[in-house]
């Protein structure tokens, strides 16, 4: 009887361990998807500049268009609704991400190089060109019954590269 109990315990332990490893691997995959989506979205957004401002070599962001572009690219890469950022059916996410900070530094409000510091989000960067700073909070889904979803904050700094 004791060997049956031991075998049963080992089977339960193996399934529990497998579930924990699966959850950790899925969290890693989702985190990399978030990072890649943030890079793509910010790269797209920093290209939205006022066309006439590039003629003199001092580009100025069209902030409204850049914000819309950021949201659209982020949504397309993460399975979210582009206007509300709410998760679409079959999305990895169950909670809409929140853009908690979005700042634009260009020739209208800074000279370069510009030293940007935001202690709240751990950003300390020297901006050599017009740049966008965006911070988004994501609720990471859980794939294990005993692991609660948790929130991560992802900061991103992206500079205008020109055309």
Task: Describe each PLM feature range.
Residues 105-107, 111-163:
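Low-complexity, S/T/G/P-rich flexible repeat/linker segments used as non-globular hinges
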């Amino acid at each position: 009887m004791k060997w049956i109990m031991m075998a049963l315990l080992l089977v339960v332990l193996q399934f529990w361990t497998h579930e924990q490893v699966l959850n950790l691997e899925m969290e890693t995959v989702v985190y990399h998807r978030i990072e890649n989506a943030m890079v793509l979205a910010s790269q797209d957004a920093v290209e939205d500049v006022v066309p006439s401002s590039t003629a003199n070599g001092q580009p100025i962001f069209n902030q409204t268009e850049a914000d819309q572009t950021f949201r659209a690219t982020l949504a397309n890469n993460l399975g979210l609704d582009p206007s509300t950022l709410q998760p679409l059916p079959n999305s990895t996410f169950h909670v809409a991400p929140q853009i908690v900070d979005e700042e634009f530094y260009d020739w209208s409000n800074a000279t370069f190089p510009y030293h940007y510091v935001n202690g709240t989000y751990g950003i300390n960067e020297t901006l050599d060109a017009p740049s966008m700073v965006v911070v988004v909070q994501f609720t990471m889904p859980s794939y294990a019954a005993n692991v609660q979803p948790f929130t991560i904050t992802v900061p991103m700094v992206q500079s205008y590269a020109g055309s």
